[in-house]
Amino acid sequence: MAENDEKAAEAARAAAPTPRPADCLPLFQAVSDRVFPRFAGVLGGQKPIIKVRDMRTRWGSCHPAKRQITLAARLALQPPEAVEYVVVHEYCHFVHPDHQAGFWALGASILPDWKARRALLRNAR
């Protein structure tokens, strides 16, 4: 029964229209506020700017020089664990701009189950 529930939830997310970016900002800001303390030292105590766009090919992006994280509006339709994964992933870019071993080690230290969370997004594409 649980498998059917998950399939139904996945179908509902796929059929749902992409939310408006402004409607997603409170959710993404709340997740960012929970993640920020782990990165406060790196960011000099200043929270990054969180922006939301209608992006089709990415879940998020990070612009360290601008102290800005941009998230896809469609991310709001994904499970909370997946949203948190993307936010942590983008925060990790403030420390490691690339996807080398240090980047993944930092992410794993914050979200040990990051691979399962990323899989939620890979299945949603």
Where are these regions (language model features)?
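Active-site-proximal or metal-binding-adjacent scaffold patches in catalytic folds
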Residues: 1-85, 94-125
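Walker B catalytic acidic pair
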Residues: 90
